[in-house]
Amino acid sequence: MIIYNEAIESEVMDVLKNCGLENFTKIPGVFGKGSSSGAHFGNDIWPGRNNILFVACEEEKCKKIIFCIRELRKKLKKEGIKAFVLNLEEVT
């Protein structure tokens, strides 16, 4: 699962494409608050929104994606992107 500020959409998608990510499910326009990037609630007080990408992949691909996200985080600093690795029991 990758959560990121919608303002960096093109950078995120470019990096993930170059990293070999082809398949995902995107949930646009979600609200949240991070410890370093602040609140994004889509209103006048806390503008901005986040997007979520769900990615189901094998372990080697996961490691590559995590590496790409870490490199992007170094470049963007506090713009707001996090990746979470969750165990996937089964895909039908």
Question: Which positions does each model-derived feature cover?
Answer:
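Positively charged, small/polar-rich N-terminal and surface patches that mediate targeting and assembly
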Residues: 1-92
